[in-house]
């Protein structure tokens, strides 16, 4: 069954609502330039209230390694998502399983995938202005081609109206959504989250 991650969680209300809808993982953005930014202490307070068996993911962009590892410990992160230009060596020093994000413009964007020995590869649309959460899509054929390298988490422009099509086309390990289920940056829409999870899992 396709896993679902709801990213950009900033409130306990949204976290519990996403879990109730059937989300497998929640993402917390520790990148201060993001409109979905949350501080480690605030995230930790939310995470402590979550039910068991929900995966907790922390998103970082070219952060100091010590900050990543300290935040992972403070929050009890299950997985670290690296969304910048982090090297394979850097990934190897993170004290959690790593999901490395690649911002896809074309096949050349994925040339470095084999260099990264990580738990999963997140494929997102390229934007010169933002590291994720843009609502932009990329050609899913690139995701299909990348599946031979390992687990693929599909992101970029997904929403309740197209996620079933994406799952049918790519058959990814998981799908990741942020802006596609929002009322405003950092606040989720209950009905969109419910529909997204249901649509993502209906073909499984």
Curated annotation (Swiss-Prot):
GO biological process: L-tryptophan biosynthetic process
InterPro entries noted in UniProt: Aldolase_TIM, PRAI_dom, RibuloseP-bd_barrel, TrpF_fam
Superkingdom per UniProt: Bacteria
Gene Ontology molecular function: phosphoribosylanthranilate isomerase activity
Enzyme Commission no: 5.3.1.24
The UniProt record lists the keyword Transmembrane: no
Reactions this protein catalyses: N-(5-phospho-beta-D-ribosyl)anthranilate = 1-(2-carboxyphenylamino)-1-deoxy-D-ribulose 5-phosphate
Membership in a protein family: Belongs to the TrpF family.
Name recorded for this polypeptide: N-(5'-phosphoribosyl)anthranilate isomerase
